[in-house]
Amino acid sequence: MRFCIRDGAKRQKKRGTAAMSFLPDDVIDTAEIAGSNYINVGTLLPFFKDALPEIAYKLHKNGKTWVLDPVAAGIGKTRTAILESFRTYPPTIVRGNASEIIALDAMWGLAQHDSTVPGTRPAGVEAVDEVDSAVDAAKRVARHLAKYSPVGAGAVAVSGAVDLVTDGERVFRLPGGSAMMTKITGAGCSLGGVTATYLAVAEPLVAAISASLLYNRASEIAEAKSSGPGSFQVTLLDALWNVTAEEVAASEIIID
C-alpha cells in the first residue's frame, strides 16, 4: 500500500501491488495488510494536515515500515507542519533531493549544534544544493529514523547527479542514471513507491540502495532509446519492467 498524494506518479509504480488512497481511514485499514507504506507530500489537500500525522502515528503504533518523500520541504505552512509532525513518529526510509533532506534535518532540529549546515531556504521541488552538501544532514536523519524504526534501522536516499544512500553510519554513492530524469514529472515520487516495494522484502539500507540502482539502470536504458522527455517517460516504464537483476547487480557502488 502506498498513500501517494502526487497525482503524476500514480501511473509509474511497477512490479509492486499498490493500493493508493486519499482517505485516512482507508489508508489506516489497508496498512494492516500492506508489506510497506509510502507517504508523499507533493500534492496536499486541506484535511491532510490532520490526517497524515494520524496515519504516521498509527503506522508507528502498529510497527509498520514506511517511506517518506518530503517533496518541497520548507515550502508552505501546511506542508511544514506535516513534515515537522513526522519527527515524533518518523518513517523508516526518507527519499528526497539534497535540499529536501537539508530542510527536513533542520525542521526536526537535528542540526541545531552543527554550524556547517547550509541555509535552510525553501527550495521547491528542485534541488538548489549539491548532494555533497547533504551528507551530514542525511546521516543525522538516518540515525533519527533508526531510533524509532520497527526494524531497528533506517536509511536516507538522496537523489542527485550521483545518488547517495546512508544508514547514518555508512555512506554509499551510486554513480550513473540519466539527466533526463530531471526533465519529466513524477520520477522521484515513483522512485519512492519502488523504494517502498523493496522495503516490504528487505532491510531499509538494502531497499534504498536497490531501488536507486534499479532506477539508475532503467533510466540509462531509456535515455539510449528515446529522443526527448516525452518518449523517455514512456521508455522508462518499459525499461523498469525489462531491466534484469544482473544489470542492476553490475552497478558501481562507491563506499565512503
What are these regions (language model features)?
Residues A138-A146, P204-S219, L236-L237:
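Short, well-structured alpha-helical segments that form the helix of a local strand-helix-strand
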Residues M1-L68:
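Conserved N-terminal subdomain of the carbohydrate kinase-like
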Residues T78-V171:
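Conserved phosphate/ATP/ADP-binding segment of small-molecule kinases
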Residues A9, T17-A19, G35-Y38, K64-W66, ...:
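Structural motif
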Residues F48-N97:
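Glycine/small-residue-rich loop that forms an oxyanion/phosphate-binding "nest" at active or ligand-binding sites
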Residues A103, K183-L213:
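Short, small-residue alpha-helix embedded
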Residues L174-G186:
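Short pre-catalytic strand/loop immediately N-terminal to key active-site residues, enriched for Gly-Thr
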